Amino acid sequence: MQNLQEKASEWSGVETNHAFAIDDTNLFQKLGLQTFINLSTNFYNRVYVDDEEWFRSIFAKSDKDKAIQNQYEFLVQRMGGPPLYSQRRGHPALIARHRPFPVTHEAAERWLLHMQQALDNISDIDHDSKIMLMNFFRHTAYFLVAGVEQKNQSLHPCKDADGRHPCKNF
């Protein structure tokens, strides 16, 4: 059985060492707080007006300003800055926090589309940093897909991929 990092690498096409190249550079020091606020704001401005209703509905019960704050605080912390997210919300626990949402391959790709567009729209981020960030985002998106699938499977071990309950036949 593959571990979550291996699945994330396989599904995302991003090797773990490339996904975590962000740890070799303090992107918070390099880019600054305002850049992460701008990135998160730009990203969620796109998400909340997405053309696809199914994707918008994932975020419908979330306050946009809180989503922006949660994301930029997480990014600041993860990219080498102060632990803003943990101070306010506790451990990031990404899989657990995303479990209530339909974190699927399709949703991950849609999320990544908006993040790529947001990155492309922020001129304060240099090309190499954009590549590092996008590798991290792509790998992490599929890490979440794998983690949520695994958690859901452990809660419903007798459900197959189509939602049927094959164990009831015994």
From Swiss-Prot:
Query: Which parts of the sequence bind heme b?
Result: H98
Q: Which Pfam families match?
A: Bac_globin (PF01152)
GO MF, one annotated term: heme binding
Q: Which SUPFAM superfamilies did the record assign?
A: Globin-like
Keyword Metal-binding applies? yes
Biological process GO terms, please? nodulation; response to nitric oxide
Q: Which UniProt keywords apply?
A: Heme, Iron, Metal-binding, Nodulation, Oxygen transport, Transport
InterPro entries, per database record = GlbO/GLB3-like (IPR044203), Globin-like_sf (IPR009050), Globin/Proto (IPR012292), Hemoglobin_trunc (IPR001486)
Q: What induces it?
A: Down-regulated by nitric oxide (NO), particularly during nodulation mediated by Sinorhizobium meliloti inoculation.
Does the keyword section mention Repressor? no
**SUBUNIT field:** Homodimer when ferric.
Similarity remark = Belongs to the truncated hemoglobin family. Group II subfamily.
Q: What does this protein do?
A: Hemoglobin-like protein that exhibits an unusual concentration-independent binding of O(2) and CO. Required for general plant development and during nodulation. May promote shoot organogenesis from root explants.
Question: Know the name of this protein?
Answer: Group 2 truncated hemoglobin 3-1
* Recorded name of the encoding gene: GLB3-1
